[in-house]
C-alpha cells in the first residue's frame, strides 16, 4: 500500500516503508538528506536492510522510526541483490524527487516519520454543492494543455496545478461546468504529452506540481462546486519500478496466455490481471490501493478508466468499480461518485444490470459514447444518409439524441444503447484527435466551408486564418469563420440537450483550433489550448457566452436531468435523401407535451436555409417561452396562421426553447 499512512483505518502516519519484490531477494534502502545534495554520492549514503514481512515473503519492510534519524527530508531508493548500479525507486512513493534519477522522499520530525498536513476543513462553500451524476457537465482537461510556452510558435504544453487554480478556475466556474475530467496527472515519462503511461501511481507528475498543489487544486475545485474525476491508466505502465522489483508477478511477457487476450501495450508493460498459480492477483491489489489513495488523500470524485478494451477483464473492472465506490461512500457518505470507462468497442452493456455481466451487475457506471460524437459529425457534414434495408434517418436521429440505441457504422446496424442518461458521456471532441473524423470540432466544421469556396482547409491554413481575423483575413474568410462558429453553437445545442452527460474538451467552448498536425501521434498530444483565441474575434466570445447559457440550462432545468424525450415533428420527406432535414424534439420531464418546465429543440440538419418555417406547437403562451443561446441573426418564434409556430432555420442550425 502507499508508503505513508494507514489511510483507510485512520491510524495516522505509518513508520514503515514496505515494497514488493520477488521471493528470496535481498532488499536494501539507501538514503540521504536532500540538503546534502552538494555532496551528492548515492554510493556513500547510509544503507539499511529490509526484512521479509511475516507471512508475506514477497513483501519487505523497514521501520523508519527505529533508525534514530535526525530531522530532515530524505530521498531514498532501493538496491536489489546488491546491484548498486541499478537503484530502484519506490513504486508506492507518494512524494517523489528527481535528481540524477527518480526517488521517493520520506520526512522525519522529532525522530519519527512525519508528513506535511493538509487542511480540508474549508473544502466546501455555501451555494456550491457537488452535483449528482444526472446534473454533470464535464470539462475534459489535459493538464499540460492548460498553458503554453511563451514562444507561441513552439506550442509546448506547460500547464500546472498552480496555473489552473490561479488563471483558469474562475473562468471555468463562470462557464458553468461542474466537473473536470483530468487527463492522467500521476507521474509519467510522457511529461509533455497526455501522460498515458504512468510511472508512479501514487504521486503527481513533478512537472505539474507537488502533492500539496494537487490537493489544493482539488480543494479549489470543490469550493466552486466542481467535481474532479481522475483519468487513470491501468492497462499498462511505463518505467514503473515494479518492473525492476518483481516483473513476472506484476506484468505480462509475450509468452503469457493472458497476453493473447489483451490489447495494445503502447510500447509499455501490460499489467497481469489473471490469477497466478496460487490464485493471487498482486497487480489488481496495486490498482485497488491506488483507487483508495486517490479517494482518501486527493478526494477524487470519480475515475475515468483508460483502455477498457485493452484490459479486457470485466470482472476485475467491476471489482475496481465496487471497491472505489465502497471506499468513497465510507469516507464521504453524502458525496456523488462515478466510474467511467473508455471502451473503444462501444459496449453500452457494461453499464447495464444484466445476467451476462459478472455477478449479473454493471461493470462501470458510464462509458464514453463514441457513437454520439460520430453521428453528430455525420449530421454536420451531411453524411447521415439512409440506405435500403437499413434504419431510417429519423431512427438514427432518435438514437443519437436519446441514446436508446447506438449506431455502428462498421456493421451498419444498431447496437444496445443506454437505459439512463448517466450511463453515456456524450461529446463533440475528445483529447484523442488523430483521425480526420476525430479532430477538433472547429477544424471539422471550418475546413469544408473553406474548401467549398476555393480556400485550403489544412491545419496550417485554419491556424493562420484564426490568428489573423483582425488583420490579414479577407471578408469571405471572416464570414466563413463566423459561420463555422455558428454551426458549433448548434452542435453545442444538440450536445447539451441530448440524453447523456455532456463533456467538453478544453478550448472547444470558444472554438479553438489545432496548431499542430493532429495526424502525428506525438504532435497531437503536445498542442495546448490557445487561450488568446477566446477573444480572437467577437464571434469567439459570443460562442463562449452561448455555451455558458446552454450549460446553465443543462445543470438547472429539471427536464434535462431526466431521460424522457418525445420527438413531435419530422418533415414528411425527412427520410428521403433529397428531403428537408428538419425535426423537433422535447425533453418532457415525463409530462404531456405542452406542459411547463419543458425543453424544445428545433433542428435543421440539412444544407437548405429557411427564412420562414412552420412546425406544430403544443405550448400556448409564447410570451412564457425563452429562447436559450439563440443565433446572432434569426427570426423570433411567432404563431403562424394555423396551430403551429413559425421561425427561421439556417442550414445546419439548432434552436433551443425553454418553457
Residue ranges and their predicted role:
Residues 137-141, 180, 228-230, 303, ...:
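Hydrophobic faces of well-ordered beta-strands that scaffold small-molecule active sites
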Residues 15-22, 27, 605-622:
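Surface-exposed beta-strand/loop patches in extracellular or lumenal glycoproteins
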Residues 93, 123-133, 142-299, 308, ...:
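Substrate-binding/active-site clefts of carbohydrate-active enzymes
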Residues 533-574:
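Aromatic- and carboxylate-lined catalytic core of secreted/periplasmic carbohydrate-active enzymes
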Residues 639-659:
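C-terminal beta-strand-rich structural cap/linker in extracellular carbohydrate-active enzymes
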Residues 529, 542, 550-552, 614-641, ...:
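C-terminal accessory region downstream of the catalytic core in glycan-modifying enzymes
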Residues 1-21, 44-45, 49-138, 147-156:
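The feature marks proteins involved in alpha-glucan
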Residues 100, 104-107, 321-327, 334-519, ...:
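Conserved alpha/beta catalytic core and glycan-binding cleft of carbohydrate-active enzymes
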Amino acid at each position: 500500500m502507499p508508503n505513508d499512512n494507514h489511510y483507510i483505518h485512520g491510524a495516522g502516519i505509518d513508520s514503515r516503508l514496505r515494497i514488493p519484490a520477488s521471493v528470496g531477494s535481498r532488499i536494501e534502502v539507501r538514503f540521504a538528506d536532500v540538503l546534502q545534495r552538494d555532496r551528492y554520492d548515492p554510493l556513500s549514503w547510509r544503507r539499511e536492510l529490509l526484512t521479509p514481512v511475516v507471512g508475506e515473503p514477497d513483501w519487505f519492510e523497514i521501520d523508519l522510526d527505529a533508525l534514530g534519524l535526525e530531522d530532515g527530508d530524505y530521498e531514498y531508493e532501493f538496491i536489489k541483490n546488491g546491484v548498486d548500479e541499478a537503484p530502484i525507486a519506490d513504486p508506492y512513493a507518494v512524494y517523489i524527487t528527481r535528481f540524477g534519477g527518480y526517488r521517493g522522499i520520506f520526512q522525519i520530525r522529532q525522530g519519527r516519520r512525519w508528513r506535511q498536513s493538509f487542511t480540508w476543513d474549508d473544502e466546501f462553500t455555501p451555494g456550491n454543492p457537488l452535483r449528482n451524476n444526472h446534473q454533470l457537465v464535464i470539462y475534459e482537461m489535459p493538464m499540460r494543455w492548460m498553458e503554453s510556452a511563451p514562444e507561441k510558435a513552439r506550442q509546448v504544453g506547460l500547464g500546472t496545478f498552480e496555473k489552473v487554480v490561479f488563471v483558469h478556475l474562475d473562468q471555468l466556474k463562470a462557464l458553468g461546468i461542474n466537473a473536470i475530467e483530468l487527463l492522467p496527472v500521476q507521474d509519467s515519462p510522457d511529461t509533455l504529452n497526455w501522460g498515458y503511461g504512468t510511472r508512479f501511481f501514487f504521486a503527481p507528475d513533478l512537472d505539474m506540481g507537488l502533492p500539496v498543489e494537487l490537493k489544493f487544486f482539488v480543494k479549489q475545485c470543490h469550493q466552486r462546486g466542481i467535481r474532479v474525476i481522475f483519468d487513470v491508466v491501468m492497462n499498462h505502465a511505463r518505467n514503473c519500478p515494479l518492473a525492476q522489483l518483481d516483473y513476472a508477478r506484476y506484468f505480462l511477457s509475450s509468452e503469457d496466455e493472458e497476453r493473447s487476450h489483451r490489447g495494445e501495450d503502447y510500447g509499455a508493460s501490460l499489467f497481469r490481471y489473471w490469477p497466478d498459480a496460487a490464485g493471487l492477483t498482486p497487480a489488481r491489489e496495486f490498482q485497488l490501493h491506488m483507487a483508495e489513495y486517490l479517494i482518501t488523500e486527493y478526494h477524487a470524485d470519480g475515475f475515468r478508466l483508460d483502455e477498457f478494451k485493452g484490459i479486457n477483464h470485466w470482472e476485475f473492472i467491476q471489482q475496481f468499480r465496487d471497491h472505489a465506490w465502497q471506499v468513497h461512500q465510507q469516507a464521504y457518505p453524502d458525496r456523488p461518485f462515478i466510474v467511467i470507462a473508455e471502451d473503444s468497442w462501444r459496449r453500452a452493456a457494461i453499464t447495464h444490470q444484466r445476467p451476462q455481466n459478472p455477478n449479473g451487475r454493471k461493470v462501470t457506471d458510464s462509458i464514453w459514447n463514441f457513437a454520439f460524437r460520430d453521428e453528430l459529425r455525420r449530421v454536420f457534414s451531411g453524411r447521415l444518409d439512409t440506405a435500403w434495408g437499413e434504419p431510417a434517418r429519423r431512427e438514427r436521429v432518435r438514437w443519437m439524441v436519446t441514446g436508446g440505441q447506438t449506431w455502428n457504422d462498421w456493421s451498419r446496424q444498431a447496437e444496445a444503447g443506454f437505459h439512463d442518461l448517466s450511463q453515456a458521456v456524450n461529446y463533440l471532441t475528445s483529447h484523442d484527435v488523430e483521425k480526420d473524423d476525430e479532430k477538433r470540432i472547429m477544424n471539422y466544421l471550418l475546413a469544408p466551408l473553406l474548401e467549398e469556396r476555393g480556400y485550403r482547409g489544412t491545419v496550417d491554413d485554419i491556424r493562420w486564418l484564426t490568428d489573423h481575423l483582425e488583420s490579414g483575413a479577407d471578408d469571405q474568410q471572416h464570414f466563413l469563420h463566423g459561420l463555422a462558429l455558428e454551426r458549433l453553437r448548434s452542435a453545442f445545442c444538440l450536445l447539451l440537450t441530448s440524453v447523456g452527460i455532456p463533456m467538453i474538451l478544453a478550448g472547444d467552448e470558444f472554438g479553438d483550433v489545432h496548431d499542430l498536425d493532429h495526424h502525428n501521434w506525438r504532435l497531437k498530444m503536445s498542442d495546448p489550448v490557445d487561450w488568446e483565441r477566446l477573444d480572437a474575434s467577437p464571434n469567439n466570445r459570443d460562442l463562449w457566452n452561448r455555451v455558458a447559457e446552454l450549460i446553465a440550462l443543462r445543470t438547472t432545468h429539471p427536464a434535462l436531468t431526466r431521460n424522457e424525450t418525445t420527438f413531435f415533428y419530422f418533415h414528411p420527406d425527412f427520410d428521403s435523401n433529397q428531403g428537408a432535414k428538419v425535426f423537433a424534439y422535447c425533453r418532457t420531464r415525463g409530462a404531456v407535451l405542452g406542459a411547463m418546465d419543458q425543453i424544445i429543440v428545433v433542428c435543421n440538419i440539412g444544407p437548405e436555409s429557411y427564412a420562414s418555417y412552420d412546425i406544430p406547437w403544443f405550448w400556448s403562451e409564447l410570451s412564457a417561452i425563452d429562447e436559450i443561446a439563440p443565433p446572432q441573426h434569426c427570426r423570433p418564434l411567432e404563431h403562424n396562421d394555423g396551430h403551429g409556430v413559425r421561425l427561421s432555420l439556417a442550414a445546419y442550425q439548432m434552436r433551443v426553447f425553454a418553457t
